[in-house]
Each structure stands twice: as structure tokens, then as C-alpha cells.
Curated annotation (Swiss-Prot):
Name of this protein: Fibroblast growth factor 4
Induction (free text): By retinoic acid.
Function statement: Plays an important role in the regulation of embryonic development, cell proliferation, and cell differentiation. Required for normal limb development during embryogenesis.
UniProt tissue specificity: Posterior ridge.
Originating organism: Gallus gallus (Chicken)
Range of residues in the leader sequence: 1-23
Segments forming a coiled coil: none
Domain of life: Eukaryota
Subunit: Reciprocal interactions may create a positive feedback loop between sonic hedgehog (SHH) and FGF4.
SMART domains documented for this protein: FGF
Amino acid sequence: MLSAAALLPALLLGLLWPGAVRGRPPPGRLPPGPRQRRWDAALFARSVARLPAERRDAARDGDYLLGYKRLRRLYCNVGIGFHIQVLPDGRIDGIHSENRYSLLEISPVERGVVSIFGVRSGLFVAMNSKGKLYGSTHVNDECKFKEILLPNNYNAYESRIYPGMYIALSKNGRTKKGNKVSPTMTVTHFLPRI
């Protein structure tokens, strides 16, 4: 429900917007057709939805958890090229060809932070304090990664709880310890593929 502080700007916007009030069009303009009226109504609705009071309410409700979940395969172009796979026994490694264990669900946890879920294995990608990747049955702080867009349009995934540790694959497809790599190394560069 809109608060009084949010209603005043909405009311003023509705009164001052020329397309919001039905009447004569301004001089030199044709009367708006049905398409133009729908467009004006859509723009008005969008502007009302972005009022500060509502934005605070939405952020409090934790609507980022309802964000856009992406089904992707994370491809690392190192060695012969590998996709990250999450196996049912909790191991995480790279495989050259796509398979059912390499399909991942990348979900936003908060702004710029994601969790990575192995769809077939039912495990989350997690990194421990030593930089080793493992599969976790439940989401915890070790399952949260900062998704960083690099200048070459690849992504790097940095541990949220252990800054400076990145998800990485070796040229043989094995995982590398997160504390032994940096985002300038190609072993940390991943391309999300559909």
C-alpha cells in the first residue's frame, strides 16, 4: 500500500503529465489514439512503481531472492576448454563436452552476488577457507560468489566470504585452489553459455 509520502508525487505526476488527463490535446498535437493512451498509462504505472517509499518496502521484503534465475553452463577457455560440473558425490571439476552435471542454475542472492546450483546433482558450489571447491546440500555463506564482469566479457566468481579467492579450473580440468589464482589469470575466466 502506498504511503502518504508516496501518494503526493504520484498525484502531482498524474496532474502535470499531459497524457494522463483526458481533455483537449496541446496545440499542434493530434488527439492520442488507443495505442498512445496505453503507452502513456504504461509509462505512468512504471513511474509510480519506482517511487522511493515503494522501493524501500520492496528491498525490505527481500525481493532479490525472487530474481531472475539463469540456466547456464560455465565455460572456461583454458587447455582444451572445460565446463564446470557438479557431481552428486560433491566433487567439482571441469569436463570438455557438455553433460547433465554441467547444467547450472545461477541465482542472484543480492546485488552482484550469486549462488551456483548444480541442477542434476542438487548441490550448490561452495568454497572453503582454504580455497577448495565442494558441493553443499544447503546454501550458506560459502556458497555466495561475487559475479564480476571482466573487460573481455567473461565472468570471474570471487568468494563473498573469502575475498581474493576465485573459482578456477586448471588446464587439465581440475579445480584450482582459490587462493592461488587472480582475476587476471585466464583460469578464472568463465563464459556463461546457454
